[in-house]
Amino acid sequence: MHNLAIALHNGKHQVTGSDDQIFEPSRSRLLAKGLLPPFDGWEASRIDSQLDAIILGMHARKDNPELLRAQELGLNIFSYPEFLFEISKEMTRVVIAGSHGKTTTTAMVLHVMHHAGVPTNYMV
């Protein structure tokens, strides 16, 4: 999730987050971008109607106080894969799958796209 937070931040979106624990290297990377939460854990008061969306980590429990508050406020709530789909649904997508060679194939495709002058984004 921290890579998504950093990517959104780099895209000029206002980003906040929370988790029960944040480990290295995520902690240092978030700190360097000014995105490290001020404390570990969840607090319902951090969720208000000004938020555009909530993106849940895969370990978020149904009784998470921030999730409950977001539901109470009727906020848009996405899982990580749902959010990735939402932001890319109008884009042409290339999916590379298989047992071996996915990262290498992805790098080759990106290299070709870059040299062809085609703007691209990627997710590995």
Regions found by a protein language model. Give the residues of each.
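ATP-dependent carboxylate-amine ligase
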Residues: 1-22, 31-37, 50-54, 72-75
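Conserved active-site and cofactor/substrate-binding residues in soluble primary-metabolism enzymes
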Residues: 3, 25, 104
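Phosphate-binding loop of NTP-binding sites
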Residues: 7, 31, 45-46, 58, ...
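Short, ordered loop/turn segments at secondary-structure junctions
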Residues: 20-21, 42, 82-83
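Short alpha-helix adjacent to the SAM-binding motif of class I
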Residues: 27-29
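Short amphipathic alpha-helix with an adjacent loop that forms part of the alpha/beta core around
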Residues: 41-50
